């Protein structure tokens, strides 16, 4: 699991790679990047939305400002497993994230069943405000994927992730039900994301140019909704 950070801001850019681009890039990253200590991990999320899917639709419209609320775990959780309640906002290309950690069962009861958590931090209050603002957020989708994370050997603020086997379901969204779902991308495709506190190093921009890897506007949740989720069933 990645180190826990309650508040941060950064630039995030996604890239959709085919198998040849992934293999070429992976082969030259080792001198610059090191693997996350956990190696490959499975990340599971519940995304929350209004009954008319307002947040998914706004995300797909590529607005200047957008936000999302999700509950994240590493692997299929049990009630006592650690989980992250995340409020993620993006404004003019900068990502601002607020997140708190609590047992999955407690987080689920809060976000899905409306039971107030023990947590009373400022971040918890911001999340509670968002729940109140939208009024009727429901568990809209479970979305899971397998991730390999790399960290820069020189710049602690630079991170690259590779997500494969992205799958989702609109029913039985409780993550305790497993990490299965319909595939969002082709098996040969990899979603890469570069996360940085500032500009990218020259060696990385040179690699992206050499392998013709270009930025892509891609939201996992919005893409799943737009591709398959025209009749999403909200499940608790």
Sequence positions of predicted segments:
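Phosphate-end processing signature that detects enzymes handling 5′-triphosphorylated RNA
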Residues: 1-236
